[in-house]
Amino acid sequence: MEPSALRKAGSEQEEGFEGLPRRVTDLGMVSNLRRSNSSLFKSWRLQCPFGNNDKQESLSSWIPENIKKKECVYFVESSKLSDAGKVVCQCGYTHEQHLEEATKPHTFQGTQWDPKKHVQEMPTDAFGDIVFTGLSQKVKKYVRVSQDTPSSVIYHLMTQHWGLDVPNLLISVTGGAKNFNMKPRLKSIFRRGLVKVAQTTGAWIITGGSHTGVMKQVGEAVRDFSLSSSYKEGELITIGVATWGTVHRREGLIHPTGSFPAEYILDEDGQGNLTCLDSNHSHFILVDDGTHGQYGVEIPLRTRLEKFISEQTKERGGVAIKIPIVCVVLEGGPGTLHTIDNATTNGTPCVVVEGSGRVADVIAQVANLPVSDITISLIQQKLSVFFQEMFETFTESRIVEWTKKIQDIVRRRQLLTVFREGKDGQQDVDVAILQALLKASRSQDHFGHENWDHQLKLAVAWNRVDIARSEIFMDEWQWKPSDLHPTMTAALISNKPEFVKLFLENGVQLKEFVTWDTLLYLYENLDPSCLFHSKLQKVLVEDPERPACAPAAPRLQMHHVAQVLRELLGDFTQPLYPRPRHNDRLRLLLPVPHVKLNVQGVSLRSLYKRSSGHVTFTMDPIRDLLIWAIVQNRRELAGIIWAQSQDCIAAALACSKILKELSKEEEDTDSSEEMLALAEEYEHRAIGVFTECYRKDEERAQKLLTRVSEAWGKTTCLQLALEAKDMKFVSHGGIQAFLTKVWWGQLSVDNGLWRVTLCMLAFPLLLTGLISFREKRLQDVGTPAARARAFFTAPVVVFHLNILSYFAFLCLFAYVLMVDFQPVPSWCECAIYLWLFSLVCEEMRQLFYDPDECGLMKKAALYFSDFWNKLDVGAILLFVAGLTCRLIPATLYPGRVILSLDFILFCLRLMHIFTISKTLGPKIIIVKRMMKDVFFFLFLLAVWVVSFGVAKQAILIHNERRVDWLFRGAVYHSYLTIFGQIPGYIDGVNFNPEHCSPNGTDPYKPKCPESDATQQRPAFPEWLTVLLLCLYLLFTNILLLNLLIAMFNYTFQQVQEHTDQIWKFQRHDLIEEYHGRPAAPPPFILLSHLQLFIKRVVLKTPAKRHKQLKNKLEKNEEAALLSWEIYLKENYLQNRQFQQKQRPEQKIEDISNKVDAMVDLLDLDPLKRSGSMEQRLASLEEQVAQTAQALHWIVRTLRASGFSSEADVPTLASQKAAEEPDAEPGGRKKTEEPGDSYHVNARHLLYPNCPVTRFPVPNEKVPWETEFLIYDPPFYTAERKDAAAMDPMGDTLEPLSTIQYNVVDGLRDRRSFHGPYTVQAGLPLNPMGRTGLRGRGSLSCFGPNHTLYPMVTRWRRNEDGAICRKSIKKMLEVLVVKLPLSEHWALPGGSREPGEMLPRKLKRILRQEHWPSFENLLKCGMEVYKGYMDDPRNTDNAWIETVAVSVHFQDQNDVELNRLNSNLHACDSGASIRWQVVDRRIPLYANHKTLLQKAAAEFGAHY
């Protein structure tokens, strides 16, 4: 039976269940769980001081009215003195600390001090704010409360008046109250894990609140977090529940109207036996029972408060789930053991930290043992090890009690998690807490997915995909894809690629997941550190459509994203997201603070709830998600999404383009390198998929290159690759083959160039079959005109015709410049003008040719981005300038000079045609890059040239005022010196006054150097000029020139390594240019231009790109092509995965993982390792137990009948009375604990619905045959309303002497299903063994109390009437009832009135006129179980035995079934009746579920 349900089953008539948990509203839930209210209140105080005073006044009036304290009202002198030697009352306080009336003579004079009589409640006088003097100046909250204060009042105080958010998780930390030593590493792990889970989930941490032991450890963990965290991360909520009477210096906290704030001094040296409050806790609840110095007063109130909070429900996206709670245990003593036992009994999962000492280590040592192996001697041994100092104080009864409690704790394995440092993959406490919550969640009964959903969010928050895969995504719970959408969004934003992969494996379809609202939400939560976020902000601020009255922070729309993406992809693409028609949709503001998405997903749930009514999907959701991941440079996430993409080659190339553009603007070098590496990876992916396609079908693969992709801005794969400069992709053999085919047009690529040249020179040869065509119609039956058109429109022919034309133009141009340049232009010169005009028309055609409709400005920018176009425009403008000067007689010669210079530019233009050559093409690139090298080299060279030239000029020449000669001397001569032209006069040897002008008056001679006129010798220091010359030549000729050569060599090597790629890449531009160029060469091209002018300007025919380079396919053809591409993409991914597995590094990693798995398997405890073998042994043991019991019954019967003497009785093994003789109705699963075959529920220490505590009975002491000398159970018999139908009360045996056992006593049947039972001292003994309690308890009679449980079942059917199935098996429905104040559903059975056949509960839901017919159904029903029922109300002298009868209706139209349905009704208001699907996770009492499991097994149905 589930622990939380055990104590609820103990009502007088099985119907008294506890009430439903109350439901609280979600108080101001925000998406960020980490935002603390203390910080909110702090800012609120700063802004609203008057409101703060009102709040204090409200608190001062509310708390005294609703919260009380306790005061001793009568002084009874104690035999003990205080630490100061003063006389104290038995409450622990002195005379001075009592009220004045308490020390006066009173009516209680002479009586013994009783807290129930001598302690009274009064309005509390200690509450408000607290500040720890000398330490942190943060304001804390505190309140003094009575130990009897309702939990609802305290919870109201915390959530409403203290302003705490409703927690998403409750962490109760318990353990050693005194300081203890922990290993530094374990201490660090504990602190880090505790803070991580609290910060991530928005949890409340509840401790004892004192500055010692585990509470101090928690406080220091919170302190370290506060010191290292930012303001936005908020404050952890740490609540200390301490005993008021043990708080040192508590007098300073008392003030009738509250203290705002109270100053508290942390005085550890003077605290004595008391304790100080911990300064690192945020809130304190000080529990008062009117005593002083008594520890443990807060435990009951803390337990009730934690249970109350955990029973509250919190709205999560329209679904109410309970607040999960977990107990974390460090070290500890008897109190800690009691706390763990209570926690597990109430269904609270516990995490025990092994290595922390004492109780925690004792439990950790035995946690993996079967309960039957946890014996008194074993616990005694463990206590002697871990409690060495106080072991001698342990009495036998105390050891027995500890053994019983530890057995109960270990028995609830689903609620116990042991954290072992560095084992089982647990590297932090937060993982152990997550596992504990998951284990507890799996053991709970519930209908919906809300519990699983919450655990999944925790797993995502802590990034434990392994736990989610093994503990959450299992066959026992089927996830709907829509249920995973909020968590999927959380995983995406928090960059958890493994979780995204897991969700995709479990049915999430990206096409259904990505809606406009989801996509917008994702972009609103971009990582602020990524470059795309800043670019998006810039676009938002500069949005021209933003209204003038708009707020400071503009609203994000998807067209803003499209604008940034178009900047990255290029203007040749269309916007990916259109502008909305209406801009009034409510959106979040941006910039959005980067919130680490919290696990509760409230905003996500509300997002999906809001969009569920009008879901609008994007055109390509996978593309949208891929872009979102790529712009944030998330490698693994993008890879997972790309694997799901449809248009995968275009997607990979687009990703490469985006990443390369982002890397150019990224300032962080590491990020830029990562982007370039990722861009290269996606280029390789595109190559890999295209290779697979090309191998399969060349024609279809080439269609993929030119297919217009609507999803990527109506562009093609080839365009994306060219714009991204993906040279490796463009140089792929398949793409080059396609370009070659385009280059040759309709000609066959097998034609040699010599054939083409011959046909160009003598085109009649076309009719001879010298040229072959690709199409058979041209090759075989083509007309001469068609063959000529196909030949002369081929780009290769157009190219060579243009080359011939251009060479003719240059020759004619050179002839005119050198031979025939007349004042009046000759016909040759006029031909040049016409020729140039045709070139101008062609450049204008290229400029205005806009098939992609980019617009004139963008097309012009794209045109001038090409170097050769710039050179063309420069040459044309220079020609126009020269022509203008040439036509003016006065400037004829300058015109000729300009035209001569222009001839150089036209000759340089020849290099463009060399790009088609594999040899010369890369050399042009080398020249371009070397020119850049020279440009930067000149800066270094200019430093030496100018410095030497100026120094030389100043030393040699005095006051040279002629600018031309000054430039010659300072710069020109110094530059010529580099090439060996050394001035002769620099050393004075070749000085000749006749070669210079002494005064500088001769314009054709330089000025003479400084010289001695008398001796005709130079006067300047010759040694200095020679030394300068030597140094100058050393640095320029040797150092700088060799540096330039090295730079050229590096550039050459760089280009030479990629010669093939560069040539293949740049030949595309030439091919595309001549593919779209008119066939006729200049100047005949003017005819084609005239035709184009008529079509475009006169007829308004739009320009269209040739289908050979950009082809828009039909929908059906495109869908088939993309499906084919997807299929081959999967092949590529499989091959890639296989290749990765074949790598040595991967093989080593796989071997390492297998070894680790094997080690883990060997380290598992025997229970887990044996698996199914243990289940078989348990089943065998059950059968043996049943056989032994039958033998015992036979022996007893024969002996009672006198068939044998006492001496002849065979000696049998002692009957383990609770060996599960078909006793699964006792609330345990068949294989729960192999060897733990005693009744369990009947030995729980706390008896249901009363304060009675049983005597602890460990497993080994259950059989009556086992000696148990200290066994002294209490006697308890409860009062019942039906006194006439029950046995006499009291602990005296006289009234019980009239009861006759083992027979039918009047109307009451006192016979046991297990045969005659022993009667000792007038009381019957439970045949299953000791329970720890004597008397009748809350049952109606001594001995067996017979009950009946009818299981009314039918087949579950769908709308068509067919029987539903699950895992092949048919599904049953059972009739269940839920009465007022009960939490669980139950079978309509239980106890019966003496002489009656129908249970009382069944009569309450069945009309009286139908009772006889139902009795007949019971008589005809199938008896499923008959025997002892392990119930928490059982005692040594009274127990429950039950009969379970199955009443099954095979046909849905059964007359009796219809009659039963019509006669069902609820006599009690609030009672519910329904048909419940039979499943092992339904919320039904565990005893009843076991009975139901037997019935399902009988029918072979699903359970």
Curated annotation (Swiss-Prot):
- Gene Ontology CC entries for this record: cell projection; cytoplasmic vesicle membrane; ficolin-1-rich granule membrane; lysosomal membrane; lysosome; perikaryon; plasma membrane; specific granule membrane
The name this protein carries in UniProt is: Transient receptor potential cation channel subfamily M member 2
Region (Disordered) residue ranges read 1-20, 1206-1237
Q: Where does Ca(2+) bind?
A: E843, Q846, N869, E1073
**What's the impact of mutating M215A?**
Abolishes lowering of temperature threshold for activation in response to reactive oxygen species. Abolishes channel activation in response to ADPR/Ca(2+)
Q: How is its activity regulated?
A: Activated by intracellular ADP-ribose, beta-NAD (NAD(+)) and similar compounds, and by oxidative stress caused by reactive oxygen or nitrogen species. Ca(2+) and PI(4,5)P2 are required for channel opening by ADP-ribose. Activation by ADP-ribose and beta-NAD is strongly increased by moderate heat (35 to 40 degrees Celsius). Likewise, reactive oxygen species lower the threshold for activation by moderate heat (37 degrees Celsius). Activated by moderate heat (35 to 40 degrees Celsius).
Name the gene. TRPM2
Q: How is it modified after translation?
A: Phosphorylation of TRPM2 at Thr-740 by protein kinase C (PKC) counteracts the effect of cytosolic Ca(2+) and elevates the temperature threshold.
PTM-bearing positions, type Phosphothreonine = T740
Q: State how changing H995A affects the protein, per the record.
A: Moderately decreases channel activity
Query: Which residue range or ranges hold the Nudix hydrolase domain?
Result: 1354-1498
Q: Which residue spans are embedded in the membrane without passing through it? A: 753-769, 971-985, 1080-1098
In the UniProt entry, what is the domain comment? Contains two binding sites for ADP-ribose, one in the N-terminal part of the channel and the other in the C-terminal nudix hydrolase domain. Both sites seem to have a role in channel opening, but the interaction of ADP-ribose with the N-terminal site is absolutely required for channel activation.
Q: What is its quaternary makeup? A: Homotetramer. Isoform 1 can interact with isoform 3. This interaction decreases Ca(2+) influx through isoform 1 and suppresses susceptibility to oxidative stress-induced cell death.
Top-rank taxon of the source lineage equals Eukaryota
Give binding positions for ADP-D-ribose 2: L1381, S1382, D1431, R1433, Y1485, N1487
* Cysteines joined through disulfide linkages: C996-C1008
The organism that produces this protein has a lineage beginning with: Eukaryota, Metazoa, Chordata, Craniata, Vertebrata
Indicate which residues the UniProt annotation says bind ADP-D-ribose 1: T174, N179, R302, G333, T336
Q: Where is this motif: Nudix box?
A: 1390-1411
Instruction: Look up and give the membrane topology term.
Output: Multi-pass membrane protein
InterPro entries the record matches = Ion_trans_dom, NUDIX_hydrolase-like_dom_sf, NUDIX_hydrolase_dom, TRPM, TRPM_SLOG
> What sections of the sequence does the record tag as coiled-coil?
none
> Where does the record place it?
Cell membrane; Perikaryon; Cell projection; Cytoplasmic vesicle
